[in-house]
Structure formats: structure tokens, C-alpha cells
């Protein structure tokens, strides 16, 4: 099943999905964790086997607003593959080659990132909340079989732990909170 979400994996091959609408912190989260040494599976589109709970790297790309790239990831600006369209489109970076040997991992949690909250941290979430984070964009971009795709997405989210992550403002705290979450919650 094609899915609009971010995904990273730890060295012990546990994958974490980050489904979210544009502008919610999905790219910031996946790129920050990639820089910390997590394996990058994708941030725009990924492929998910909903029967086996496995996520596959598809394109290995990320799309990010130029101002976010400049402020949080200035060292990645030179890696954009579409700098000629600036500022009319998001910057596109190909991060997939950095860890091309890691192409699939078992999904251990679905984490919906939220930017702009005064309190940061993780909390348990519901399947409907996660569905609302992934289904609208994913289904909108699919030309056919939307009802079947919706059922597959719901099936995956129903058998996977769901969380909300109110993101801290700085990268250091994103990393600290994720390490704590990974070590204590799963």
C-alpha cells in the first residue's frame, strides 16, 4: 500500500511511521533522526505491507520548505535536486542513497507529529486520529481503489501502537525525546 508518511528505522530494524499533513513536522522529524544515525526510509511516500506490518523504502526523498532547510538543515541545501525552482516549490532532497542497504523494517509504532504545541512530548493516540493524519493526503493522491486503500490503512493502524508527538522546537530535544520514547515506550 502506497502511503504518504515519513519512516525511519533504528539499528535494530524497528521502524517508526510519521503520518501527517504538510507542515506538521514530518520532514523535520525524519531528517533530524536521520542525522542522528537512524536509517531513512522516506518522508514523502513509502510502501507498506499492511498484512505483515513492514515498511519499504520507495523513493528515499524528502520535501521541505526552503526556510526550514535554511534554518534547521543548512548543510543539506547543497543536496537539493531542484534548487532552480526555489522558492516556488519545496526543496527536494534524496537521502535514500545514504543507507541503501536498509530497504524494509517491521513497523513498531505510528507517531503523528504536531508542531507548535506549548507542551512537548509523547502521548497515546487513537486509530481514528492516526487515520486522519494519513488518509486524506494518501487517498487524494491515489487515482484508483481508494476504498480498498482506506481499509488497508485502517487495518495497519488498528494493529500498531499509535502515538501523538508534540514536537519540541529544537533538534536536540527532538532527539532526546525520541530516544526516551524508543527506550521506554516500545
What are these regions (language model features)?
Residues 1-2:
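N-terminal pre-Walker A segment at the start of P-loop NTPase domains
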Amino acid at each position: 500500500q502506497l502511503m504518504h508518511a515519513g519512516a525511519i528505522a533504528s539499528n535494530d530494524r524497528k521502524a517508526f511511521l510519521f503520518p501527517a499533513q504538510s507542515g506538521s513536522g514530518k520532514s523535520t522529524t525524519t531528517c533530524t533522526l536521520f542525522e542522528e544515525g537512524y536509517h531513512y526510509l522516506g518522508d514523502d511516500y513509502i510502501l507498506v505491507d499492511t498484512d505483515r506490518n513492514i515498511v519499504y523504502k520507495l523513493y528515499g526523498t524528502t520535501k521541505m520548505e526552503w526556510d526550514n532547510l535554511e534554518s534547521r538543515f543548512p548543510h543539506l541545501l547543497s543536496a537539493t535536486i531542484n534548487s532552480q525552482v526555489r522558492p516556488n516549490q519545496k526543496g527536494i532532497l534524496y537521502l535514500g542513497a545514504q543507507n541503501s542497504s536498509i530497504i524494509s523494517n517491521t513497523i513498531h509504532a505510528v507517531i503523528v507529529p504536531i508542531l507548535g504545541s506549548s507542551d512537548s512530548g509523547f502521548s497515546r493516540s487513537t486509530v481514528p486520529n492516526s487515520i486522519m493524519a494519513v488518509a486524506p493526503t494518501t487517498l487524494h493522491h491515489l487515482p484508483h481503489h481508494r476504498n480498498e486503500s482506506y481499509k488497508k490503512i485502517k487495518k495497519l493502524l488498528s494493529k500498531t501502537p499509535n502515538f501523538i508527538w508534540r514536537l519540541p522546537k529544537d533538534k536536540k530535544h527532538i532527539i532526546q525525546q525520541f530516544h526516551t520514547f524508543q527506550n521506554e515506550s516500545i
